[in-house]
A protein has these predicted regions:
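N-terminal hydrophobic or amphipathic helices and topogenic motifs
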Residues: 1-59, 68
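Short loop->beta-strand "edge-of-pocket" segments that line small-molecule binding or catalytic clefts
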Residues: 17-23, 40, 118-136
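Residues that cap or flank secondary-structure elements
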Residues: 38-39, 61, 108, 127
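Alpha-helix N-cap/helix-start capping motif
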Residues: 44, 85, 132-133
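Acidic, polar ligand-binding/catalytic clefts
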Residues: 48, 52, 57-121
């Protein structure tokens, strides 16, 4: 394992602990354990592992939506956050390489005339996505 410099450790843990921001709105990445109320999932596991490597205590900070998680970056509420990289967010947040890629698709009712991407990707077709998610940010700019 690569040695973490004291400067990097100080940058990542300015409060003496690693504050990990997670998006509770994406069950593929994190969820609340119904029995304990604790957050769990890949984002939580990665945050805890980073804290272990930094030899720092970890505080998991959950946000109901990715938009709220992204907004909290400006106030310094978290040190490391797990959310989709998107050019709009990159104005305020420095992103690493992706730790996971999630494919998205369309869900339509039976008998829908929308059977192919070309049927959907045209003016006048509305697509429901979580507000201020990476999906919405992508669709808004393309």
């Amino acid at each position: 394992m690569t040695e973490i410099s004291p400067a990097a450790r100080a940058d990542l843990t300015p409060t003496g602990k690693l504050r990990v921001g997670i998006n509770l709105g994406n069950f593929l990445l994190t969820a609340k354990d119904p029995a304990t109320g604790e957050s769990r999932g890949i984002a939580v596991d990665l945050g805890r592992e980073l804290g272990r490597r930094l030899d720092a205590p970890v505080e998991i900070i959950g946000y109901p939506t990715p938009g709220e998680l992204a907004d909290a970056a400006a106030s310094g509420a978290w040190d490391v956050g797990f959310l989709g990289a998107e050019p709009h967010r990159a104005k305020e947040i420095i992103f690493t390489a992706a730790y996971v890629e999630i494919e998205a698709t369309y869900l339509v009712p039976p008998g829908s005339p929308l059977g192919a991407i070309a049927d959907v990707d045209r003016p006048g077709i509305r697509i429901a996505v979580p507000e201020r998610s990476a999906y919405e940010l992508y669709l808004s700019r393309t």
